[in-house]
Amino acid sequence: MKYAECHSVADIVREVFDLVQWDRSRSHGGRVAYYFRGENANHEGGDDVPRDLLTPGIYRGDSLLKFEPEIFNEALRVFPEEFVRDRTTFEILTRMQHYGYPTRLLDVTSKLMTAMGMVRSQGNRGDETRKRRNGFIHVFRVNADRIKYGTSDTVTALSNLARIKSDHVTIEDLQYLTAECKNERAGFFWEKGSQTTDALERDVQKVWCVRPMVNNIRVNFQAGEFFLFGCHDLKKPLQATFAESEYDDSRSPTEGIARIGILTVTPRAKEEMDDFVECLDIGDERLYPDFAHHSEMLRERFGNVR
């Protein structure tokens, strides 16, 4: 994995271009795609270094995972009108993710500019102190075989883990998923010992890149895609390293997905993004298209005009 420190927008673009060109020059076998994840700071508190492990929100905190079904059901109970258009559990998780709920999704994007916007943005929480801290852009190579659509059996099964208590989850007996999944995919099939079921048992213990339905305004504006995390027995978290050394390892949860580089984006580069925010089209009102962020943008734009 390569590291670089970026002090300007030009540094970021140049480093990503060089990194992807270098990676393409090597043989990986099969088609690949490149994805980016922007973070405005190390959310675990370290100012200067990126996180070694990238984890979804539901893994952050000792008790969140234990109460995953309660979090899921409370969101539906309190804001049913927000989810009325969502036809699958994955679509519900997508909407929850974009509004800051802890889920088993990790945001990534195929567009570098969106990742840069995430580095600059203060997100849903508006923490101004993050402007004075290093941000990070993680660059991933993803084998095309590790990319799924939101309607696949694998994604349906992994998404419905959010509805089920930890002590009910046993990888060798996934029959408990059948009732939930058949509501979304009538052809969902589970039979002990079948080839399809054996494959699903392996798939549930992996991380997958998922392309969502573009029926969510934030997904549309952000070109948002996701890493969807499965689990082991009793919902024990995956050790998702995204290491290049495990890219071809069928035993690894991150088989076919490698983090090939990390760019450290300094506060100086963040300031330059602020100066060119409209030109780059990476303002918060673009990434988070709602009344609150749009009104804040207008306040900043016109509040100090002389």
List each model region and its residues.
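Catalytic-core elements of nucleic-acid end-processing and repair enzymes
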Residues: 1-306
